[in-house]
């Protein structure tokens, strides 16, 4: 199953820009699946997939910011009071 790049976009989250790559692939049964790679850093990516491009775009808009915020919180060092 080969992925075909169908679109590259920039996604802005809190003033920072992340590159996204949208792919289409055919399953063994011949149906289409869509996936998106959100490039957070050189070695850190979020990969999401869905049955339709419309629902994938909605999923990326909802989950990419949540992932960025959670990773930002996880990287902070907390001092117990």
Predicted feature locations:
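Intrinsically disordered, low-complexity regulatory regions of eukaryotic regulatory proteins
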Residues: 5-8, 22, 35, 70
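Enrichment for repetitive, rod-forming helical segments
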Residues: 16, 23, 33, 66-69, ...
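Mixed-charge, Lys/Arg-enriched low-complexity segments
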Residues: 42-81
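Negatively charged, low-complexity tracts enriched in Asp/Glu with abundant Ser/Thr
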Residues: 1-20, 81
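A short, structured beta-strand/loop element
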Residues: 19-48
